[in-house]
């Protein structure tokens, strides 16, 4: 049933400008273009009575920071601040036993608290989800990239048959368990608009790290249980930059524009009919997968909207 919503796929919003009233009370003009073309493409424009940002932290915060400079000047100075992760570590444990099949069942079915601040969730991917092995290398810790590269090469030389079996198996996802390690420990990052993209800076706490000793120990123990090898993304092992699926904040809730970007109903301070309803609004580190938190917060925000016709 068509209820009035139209999804315009493969496009990206590049500009949002209030109409005649600078607070957006009479609506906005939204500019968008094809996001899959490397050549200059025609820009399109639509007018709307209101705006709901729901592009995830990287999409929403990037657009807000771009607009804050020229078109949405009333946005809070807190835009791009209070960004958090779950202090996350993603480690694959790949069994050397070709008869193993961990791909059947729900994606995440249990959670294990390893200490008062940490827990781990075993994750499974469906059969055929093998792309990640092209980006993986042995789990390696080290103080700098040269030490880590040396350890990687040593591991390949020491266990060549094991790694050849892992890289050339057609059943990588079936033989893999992904250990999703997360912590409640709090630290914040600030995003700023750079020359070509967003740049990040530490605001409070310790910088997120790809090298968490507790996660390494758990992965090594799991490897012994399933006769496997721990396996991480090459970006983590080589650059030391952590990977997270749960980035939060950047347009957080506050009492005023001095403490947040949106109010308790997700309305953007300084503008009418403008809301943020995604992970950008989350103001703390829940330490677990935030999907249901984001869903609940969005449902609450939508419940405050007047029903059509009232």
PLM feature spans:
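Short alpha-helical segments and helix-capping/turn motifs at coil-helix boundaries
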Residues: 11, 90, 162-167, 259-261, ...
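Short helix/loop capping segments that flank catalytic or ligand/cofactor-binding pockets
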Residues: 40-41, 61-63, 101-102, 190-191, ...
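FAD cofactor-binding and catalytic pocket of flavoenzymes
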Residues: 48-50, 76-197, 202-204, 247, ...
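A glycine-rich dinucleotide-binding beta-alpha-beta segment and adjacent secondary-structure elements
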Residues: 9, 14-17, 177-180, 199-284, ...
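A generic structural signal for beta-strand entry/edge sites
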Residues: 25-29
